[in-house]
Amino acid sequence: MQFTKLGSSPLVVSRVCLGTMTWGQQNTEAEAKEQLDVAFKEFGVNFLDTAEMYPVPTKAETQGRTDLIIGKWLKESGISRDKVVLATKVAGPGISWLPGRNGENSRVRKRDIIVSVEASLKRLGTEYIDLLQIHWPDRYVPIFGANAYNRSLEREATPFEEQLEALNELIKQGKVRQIGLSNESPYGIMKFSAAAQQLGIQPFVSLQNSYSLINRAEFDSGLSEVCSPRNENIGLLPYSPLAGGILTGKYASEQDTSSCRLTLFPGYMARYKQSLAVEAVKKYCALAKEVGLTPTELALGWCYKQSDTVASTIIGATSVAQLRENLEAFDESKWARIDNARIDDIHRQCKDPSKT
C-alpha cells in the first residue's frame, strides 16, 4: 500500500480508503468487520470513511448502524486508534429524522453540525474525528447525477461563515482534526476558502466528489484547477469509482445480479443505468479485455494511477471477494497496461453519460 498526505494537512492516508455505506443494510456486522480486518490487517489500508446518514439507502430505522459497527470494531480490533484515519460526514439538507434535529429537516447550520458530531462521536466510540466533511452543500447545487444549474431552485442557505465557526469550534475542542467538503462546486470551495482565510480558520483539505470513467468532466475542468497544490491544495477523494458497480461490467453480462445494489434498490443510482452509460461501459469493458485486465481493474486502476490528482480512492464492497479484487487492483504492473489516450478517446465519444 502507498500513502500520501491529504491536501495541505498533516494527515497521512493510504491511497485506498475503505467505504462503508452498505454496512448495516446489505452487509451484516460480521461481514463488515471481516472487510475491515482484510483491508486494515492484510492490505495495510489506514483510511476509513463513514457518514451520519449511513447505511444507504438511508432510512430512519437503519440510520447510524454503520457507525455502531465501526465503533465496535475500533474497540475489538486490536488496532490503535491513532493508526486509523477516521472520516465522517455531516448530512446536508433534507432528512427529517436525524438525531438531535427534533423532527426538522437536516441543515448545515452551526447547531446541526455540532449536534451531528456529538452523536457521531458517541456512536463511533471515539473522542475525535480525523476528517469531518460536509456531505452536501446547504445551498442548492446540482448533485447526484444532475448536470445543469437551475436558478429556479436557488434557496436561502446557511452562511459559509456560520458553518466555519461551528467547524472551528469543534477543532478547538479537539473533537475534529481536519475538515473537508463533499459534492461541492468550484464556487463553494472558493467561498469557503475566502471565508476561512478571513476568519483565520484552518482550510479544507479534501473534496469527496463522484469521479469515475463515466463521471469525470466536472472535476477535470474547474475543480481540478481549484484543488491543485498550486492553488487550494485540496486532495480529491473519489467516491463511486465503479459507478455503483456498473463499471465492473456485471450488469451488462450474464452474471446473476439479484443480490446487487442496483437490483435490490430499483431507482437507486438510476443515472448509471441510462443507455449512453451502458454503451460507455461496454466500450470500457472491451478495452479492459483487450489489455488483459478485468473491467474493475481498468476502472479502479485509472483512478489509482492518478497520484497527482487523486489522494485516496474510496472503494466499497458487499463481499470480501469484491473487496479483495478492488484492493488487488492497486498494482502498478496492472496500471502500466492502462492507456489514458484510449480511455480519453472513449470519454470523448461518451462524455459523462451518467449526467442528466
Which stretches of residues belong to each language-model region?
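N-terminal binding-site loop/beta-alpha segment at the start of enzyme catalytic domains
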Residues: 1-89, 111, 127, 172
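Aromatic/hydrophobic pocket-lining residues that form the small-molecule binding cavity
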Residues: 32, 66, 113, 117, ...
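Structural motif corresponding to the early beta-alpha repeats
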Residues: 77-106, 135
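Active-site mouth loops of central-metabolism enzymes
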Residues: 20-30, 99-111, 151-157
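Beta/alpha (TIM)-barrel catalytic core signal, keyed to glycine-rich beta->alpha loops juxtaposed to Asp/Glu
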Residues: 56, 137-345, 352-354
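Active-site groove signature of glycoside hydrolases
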Residues: 122-145
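An active-site-proximal structural segment forming one wall of the substrate-binding cleft
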Residues: 109-128
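Surface-exposed, active-site-proximal loop segments in enzymatic domains
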Residues: 57-61, 92-107, 140-149
